[in-house]
A protein has these predicted regions:
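N-terminal amphipathic/basic leader segments beginning at the initiator methionine
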Residues: 1-3
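Short, intrinsically disordered, charge-balanced linker/junction segments flanking boundaries
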Residues: 250-254
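Mg2+-dependent prenyl diphosphate-binding active-site environment of isoprenoid biosynthetic enzymes
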Residues: 6-246
Length: 254
């Protein structure tokens, strides 16, 4: 049992709030709520799932910062820079548990579908992260466009766009439209390439993390592999493909 009133446990709980307290876009949670509404659900019913998805984003960032040896996150030192790698990993693990607890707290009829979606999403994200890390370890800079897009689909697109859209449909007890997955893959890849560009063109104090870190750590990014102009061109192409995939999708769009 937990020691009653142990100040170190209170500190541990506070550390779990570090990244959420720094803010962030809330993109994934907001997209999930919008998808739930578009499918006819009350967005309030989706709030626990949206909160769990934001917890997912935050514990993944804690671990990602360790794996990437990042210096900053959201305008402040990365957690492992403040408390050390072992403590930061443990904090991320606890946040991971909090995510599952948030999902298990509901007895809604869609719970099993949502749990399965989360499990699948986490597995795909881990696969994408492994590819990214493996390329760094191997010093790979011969990655072609197809391999890069396959990596970011797993690492970024699924949990950033595809899963939020599908989860919103699950909360509405509606089968996810396959066009969402098609569009989500395109939008997620565009999101990652924009992030790659921010690392090249952004300023640390604006983007909230160390600019130039990807190049410094030997990461394979779209601008690094194919050039900045090609990055902007691919973003425009991916956005167009996403709009085409979503054409004709019906639902609440106001």
């Amino acid at each position: 049992p937990e020691p009653v009133g142990d100040p170190e446990i209170a500190r541990f709980a506070a550390l779990q709030r570090t990244y959420p307290a720094r803010g962030g876009k809330g993109l994934r949670g907001r997209l999930l709520l919008a998808a739930a509404y578009a499918h006819g659900a009350d967005p309030a019913d989706a709030l626990p799932v949206a909160a769990a998805l934001e917890l997912f984003q935050n514990w993944v960032l804690v671990h990602d910062d360790v794996e990437d040896d990042s210096d900053e996150r959201r305008g402040a030192p990365a957690l492992h820079r403040e408390v050390g790698v072992p403590v930061a990993i443990n904090v991320g693990d606890a946040m991971h548990v909090a995510m599952w607890r948030a999902l298990l707290a509901t007895d809604a009829p869609w719970r099993d579908a949502v749990l399965h979606e989360f499990a699948t999403t986490i597995a795909r994200t881990a696969e994408g992260q492994h590819l990214d890390l493996a390329w760094v370890t191997e010093g790979r800079f011969d990655v072609d466009a197809a391999a890069y897009l396959a990596m970011v689909e797993r690492k970024t697109a699924i949990y950033t766009v595809v899963a939020p859209l599908r989860l919103g449909a699950h909360v509405a007890a509606t089968p996810p439209d396959p066009r969402f997955e098609a569009a989500g893959r395109q939008l997620g890849a565009a999101f990652q390439i924009r992030d790659d560009l921010l690392d090249v063109e952004g300023q640390t104090e604006v983007i909230g993390k160390t600019a130039g870190a990807d190049e410094a750590h030997g990461k394979a990014t779209w601008p690094g592999l194919f050039g900045i102009e090609a990055a902007y061109e691919r973003i425009e192409e991916l956005d167009s493909r996403a709009r085409a995939a979503l054409s004709g999708v019906e639902g609440n769009t106001q």
